[in-house]
């Protein structure tokens, strides 16, 4: 695609680091992908995928988050194959706030990897030094040495890896789970409270029109929580509107441009969502954070959408 290649070239000319997304790609396609200047990937779900990418010079972010957890699959084979870890890192690819409270963030990746047998220093390096080397930030970060920024975690031991002290810029900010440095209250900019630039909706806004008694529609089939595919479904039509089906687990799904208020939107169908609901709406979603509405009937979908308009976002 010429437009994509032009964008990649502009980023490389500006010295940018381009992160990749190579789910399901291998062989010649992966070689072509790497040749474009993309240096990393967080999508490998098994060791073979990790190894293929490492051999092509890529950096790998091993994912452990609310969407997928890949440490258990990958770390033991990294160890048994004595694979170098200097181009391995951790990432979450999205974490639920409740998971952060219960498990932690990248510190959780360190602890889990150590439990799986990874050397503690290698695990810490994958969470710090390797990342800064990848992003060309090693001059200032990634080690404790003269001339580097003093952003430091102090652990009690090398097994639990629970931070006892936290220094930011050389200043102690947390000690024994207590914030010891004053935190300035920053006023929320007004523009941040007015980001859902949408109109009020009625059920008519969620109609999918058809003149037949039945309609064959394209639908997004959720094979897993991550993998989807396009399928065809036959749905009933009432009063010129294609309706969802609880029996087939097919709901309506709509997406609206909440950021620019352009009135751009699309309405389709979603299979295997797995919830018998009136409607669900959210402005928190990967990656656009537009307003998504899922529902079994248009009236409830309009109510859910208007609720987010009133609250200026949320779920």
Question: Locations of the language-model features?
Answer:
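Acidic, glycine-rich active-site loops and adjacent beta-strand->loop/helix elements
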Residues: 66-68, 130-131
